[in-house]
Curated annotation (Swiss-Prot):
Keywords noted in UniProt: ATP synthesis, ATP-binding, Cell membrane, CF(1), Hydrogen ion transport, Ion transport, Membrane, Nucleotide-binding, Translocase, Transport
Gene Ontology molecular-function annotations: ATP binding; ATP hydrolysis activity; proton-transporting ATP synthase activity, rotational mechanism
Keyword DNA damage: no
Protein species of origin: Streptococcus suis (strain 05ZYH33)
Gene Ontology CC entries for this record: plasma membrane; proton-transporting ATP synthase complex
Location relative to the cell: Cell membrane
Main location: membrane
SUPFAM superfamilies: C-terminal domain of alpha and beta subunits of F1 ATP synthase, N-terminal domain of alpha and beta subunits of F1 ATP synthase, P-loop containing nucleoside triphosphate hydrolases
Domain of life: Bacteria
Keyword Transport on entry: yes
Function field: Produces ATP from ADP in the presence of a proton gradient across the membrane. The catalytic sites are hosted primarily by the beta subunits.
Binding residue positions for ATP: 155-162
Protein name, per record: ATP synthase subunit beta
GN (gene name): atpD
């Protein structure tokens, strides 16, 4: 095991010099520095660049406080490796695979896998087209998720990305009994803590492994924690043959962390100050998230959109890798419609008659047509009022508003805030409900009856209790 000495510390970036006779560590190898000769207090560094003359530039996975020039650095001879297997379920890890849930840690000889791997070979990939039922009406009807696909949840700050992810974890675990890996990348520690205790209370934690590299951690940890979560998910797929759900909240923070260290590594910034290697880094992560003949990894990624600008390089780079997009719209939160999913901006390549069936496809297309026409008529309504519309247009507006409200529903994970029990709506019920609204069967019911309910039967029951 070769050793070197720290020559420079600039924030999270550390330069290490090795003697001429020592073998230089390979790129992505993990190096270890022990603070104050205390074997418990160590900092792990990852090799990013070889500068020549026996010097390597590394990124710290933990705070570099207390590191000084001249400290000894040991090469572990391999990349960061993390625990894998069924024992990881119900546990919480950091980027290095250390447990952070105050329970017993894993022994040193426990099975581990390196976080840096190649994507599966082309001939190992599977191309199935099976729908993953989420129980959330707006998603299942208009932008369905594919098993083994990649889904992006796009939205600005505070529009409900994390709540939607929590509901998806809840529904998949309760209704499908599926294994999930939740990766918190650069998000709020409070949210991670809340999620952990909520999942523990509901029993969902037994089917979930959690990995966190939160906002307060150095950029190195936020850059690599997504790979830690992915490595755990890949093991379930490749060795256990499972269908796994990988949640990443938030993929933008992965890009942001890379941007923070990019200039310190000596790279010239590109558009909007992002790292020039943005597309490569995103590709290396996304290409590993795929389905093989052994099992599948379905990933659901929250993607923060800076200043609601979809042309920003970070969300734009992520777009290229996705099968489905779920766009969250601030205007809908102002109308009190939750989840605030934009039915016209959200899309999915699974919304095709050969995948979802003729009836589902026809209903979804008609819902989109009605909502699109309603959007076009809103300018006329705002200027001239409803009286200037034809009878046909007035009927269409009434149905569009009912559809818009019916796309909302109460979430199980939001019950503590709303005081209303959540609802899981099967796809068949969703299609039936919207078909009845389009056919005019419920034109006589008040619009408010359609707000925050599950199936169409719930609408009828709610309307019966209302005075109108």
């Amino acid at each position: 095991m070769s050793s070197g000495k720290i020559t420079q510390v600039v924030g999270p970036v550390v330069d290490v010099a090795f003697a001429a006779e020592d073998k230089l560590p390979e790129i992505n190898n993990a190096l270890v520095v022990y603070k104050n000769d205390d074997s418990k207090q160590k900092v792990v560094l990852e090799v990013a660049l070889e500068l020549g003359d026996g010097v390597v530039r590394t990124i710290a996975m933990e705070s570099t406080d207390g590191l000084t020039r001249g400290m000894e650095v040991l090469d572990t001879g391999r990349p960061i490796s993390v625990p894998v297997g069924k024992e990881t379920l119900g546990r919480v890890f950091n980027v290095l695979g250390d447990t952070i849930d105050l329970e017993e840690s894993f022994p040193a000889d426990f099975e581990r896998e390196p976080i840096h791997k190649k994507a599966p070979a082309f001939d190992e990939l599977s191309t199935s087209s099976e729908i993953l039922e989420t129980g959330i009406k707006v998603i299942d009807l208009l932008a369905p998720y594919l098993k083994g696909g990649k889904v992006g949840l796009f939205g600005g700050a505070g529009v409900g990305k994390t709540v939607l992810i929590q509901e998806l974890i809840h529904n998949i675990a309760q209704e499908h009994g599926g294994i999930s890996v939740f990766t918190g990348v650069g998000e709020r520690t409070r949210e991670g803590n809340d999620l952990y205790w909520e999942m523990k209370e509901s029993g969902v934690i037994e089917k979930t492994a959690m990995v966190f590299g939160q906002m307060n951690e150095p950029p190195g940890a936020r850059m690599r924690v997504a790979l830690t979560g992915l490595t755990i998910a890949e093991y379930f797929r490749d060795v256990e043959g499972q269908d796994v759900l990988l949640f990443i909240d938030n993929i933008f923070r992965f890009t942001q962390a890379g941007s923070e260290v990019s200039a310190l590594l000596g790279r010239m910034p590109s558009a909007v100050g992002y790292q020039p290697t943005l597309a490569t880094e995103m590709g290396q992560l996304q290409e590993r998230i795929t389905s093989t003949k052994k099992g599948s990894v379905t990933s659901i990624q929250a993607i923060y959109v800076p200043a609601d600008d979809y042309t920003d390089p970070a969300p734009a780079t992520a777009f290229a890798h996705l099968d489905s997009t779920t766009n969250l719209e601030r205007k809908l939160t102002q109308l009190g419609i939750y989840p605030a999913v934009d039915p016209l901006a959200s899309s999915s390549r699974a919304l095709a008659p050969q995948i979802v069936g003729e009836e589902h496809y026809a209903v979804a297309m008609e819902v989109k047509r009605v909502l699109q026409r309603y959007q076009e008529l809103q300018d006329i309504i705002a200027i001239l009022g409803m009286d200037e519309l034809s009878d046909e247009e007035k009927t269409l507006v009434g149905r569009a508003r009912r559809i818009q409200f019916f796309l909302s529903q109460n979430f199980n994970v939001a019950e503590q805030f709303t005081g209303m029990p959540g609802s899981y709506v099967p796809v068949a019920e969703t299609v039936k409900g919207f078909k009845e609204i389009l056919d005019g069967k419920h034109d006589h019911l008040p619009e408010d009856a359609f707000r925050n309910v599950g199936s169409i039967e719930d609408v009828v029951a709610k309307a019966a209790k209302m005075k109108f």
